Structure formats: C-alpha cells, structure tokens
Amino acid sequence: MQNKIEDQITIDFLKQIHPAKAIGVILLISGLACMFLLWLIYYKGGSDYSSNLISSLPALNALLNATSTVLLLFGYKAVRSGRYLTHMRFNLTAFVTSALFLISYVVYHSFHGSTPFTGEGIIRPVYFFILITHIILSALVMPMILTSFYLAFSGKTGTHRKVSKVTLPVWLYV
C-alpha cells in the first residue's frame, strides 16, 4: 500500500536530483528571499502611498495565517490516520496560503515600512523575545518546508518523516 501511495505522489525528475544539490538550491533561494525581506522591511522604508486596501492587509494576513495553521493541523491528523494523499493536499494548500500571506506581508511592508513597538513594562521583553524567535525561525522554516516537500515528492519518505517532525512545530510557530 505504501509503495502505491509513493508512486502517486512522487515526481520523477525530483528522484534524479541528488539531495545535496536540491538542498543547496533550496538554501540559496531561501537565503536570497530572506535577504530581500530584511532589506524591504528594515532598510527600504515605507511609502507615502496609503489606501484602505493596504490598511486592510494585516487582517488578511491574520486570516491567511490562521487558515495555514488549521490546514497544517488537518494535514497532521490525516497523516497520523494513514491518509497520505489527503495529508499532501492539506500541506500543499497550507503552503499556498503561507505563500499568499508572504506576498501580502511584502506588499504591506513595502508601503507601510516597519512599525515600532511602544509597549512598556513586562510586555516589552516578552514581545521582543517572541519577535526575535519569530524572525530567526521564519528565516529557517522556508528551507525546512521546501526540503520536506522535496523529500516527499522525490520518494524519500523516511527522511521526509524525520525532517517534517521538526518542520511542523516550527511552521506552526511562525
């Protein structure tokens, strides 16, 4: 049964790519994307342009993140019950909603810039702890997700399983 599922979800050309080469490309793409985001948010600055659409993007971002979380949890439940194709569909959809979030986030911050935190007291170090861990893990999670997908679609299910056990909690956190 497992081999039949693997045959359905593997992509033949990915089987031909050596894992080290695939992971190298994943790391390169992820690194370039992270550098672009750092520049966009912290160095480029905002724009004077403002609209209702731009100001509504944080709500859309929250909706997309919540949707991704629910899809990831459904995907986890599906794989735990042996429904591998359902698991794959939930995770691919979670990836799409996460990508849409990232696009919306980039658009918002390209117009709005960064927002300084003005809170005081105990909440300030708590906020910065969450922010710093979020930034670090969000830089790490993209290559982790792409590696998980590569391993799954190239038929390396054992390694996919091991990588995904670490990837899922990080993805849920960020």
What are these regions (language model features)?
Residues 2-174:
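Alpha-helical membrane insertion/targeting regions
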